[in-house]
């Protein structure tokens, strides 16, 4: 990965942003394709397969984040790309039965809601953390509600622990 990063950095002028985005999306599609192929064969995805799927979701997030930073697709409402990513990752998590991708969906949702942790927040807590507690509690409440909805729908997927852990971490 470090070698790819150096290659892109040294040759970015020749590669260009659209080629980089296309390469990230193609790599993400390849990762998703392996999970879809496994699911269509009615096989159980291995732990390595789960992490390949997570890699695909992270590559998709990187492509969307880079496109937003480079081209300002959403303008002043730039944070909406996090909400779109949360929805896409949640759809992928439920479709492909992945707790890892669900955790990425919940993280993107928390980012959209404005819950963030930066090292700078430790040095200027009065300004940087203003309102963070309420946003974190709202996020925890949303995760509890999502877990309750999941339980109500009696989904066969074992996602309740993910919702509970995220809710507990954001509430504390």
Report each predicted region and the residues it spans.
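Alpha-helical multi-pass membrane segments and their bilayer interfacial helix-loop junctions
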Residues: 1-172
């Amino acid at each position: 990965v470090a070698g790819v990063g150096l290659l892109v950095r040294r040759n970015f002028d020749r590669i260009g942003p659209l080629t980089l985005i296309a390469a990230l999306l193609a790599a993400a599609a390849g990762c998703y394709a392996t999970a879809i192929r496994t699911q269509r064969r009615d096989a159980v995805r291995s732990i390595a397969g789960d992490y390949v799927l997570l890699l695909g979701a992270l590559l998709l997030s990187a492509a969307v984040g880079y496109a937003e930073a480079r081209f300002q697709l959403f303008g002043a409402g730039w944070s909406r790309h996090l909400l779109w990513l949360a929805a896409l990752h949640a759809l992928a998590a439920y479709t492909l039965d992945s707790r890892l991708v669900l955790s990425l969906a919940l993280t993107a949702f928390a980012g959209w809601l404005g819950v963030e942790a930066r090292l700078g927040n430790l040095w200027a807590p009065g300004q940087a953390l203003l309102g963070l507690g309420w946003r974190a509690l709202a996020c925890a409440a949303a995760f509890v509600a999502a877990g309750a909805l999941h339980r109500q729908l009696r989904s066969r997927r074992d996602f309740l622990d993910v919702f509970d852990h995220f809710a507990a971490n954001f509430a504390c």
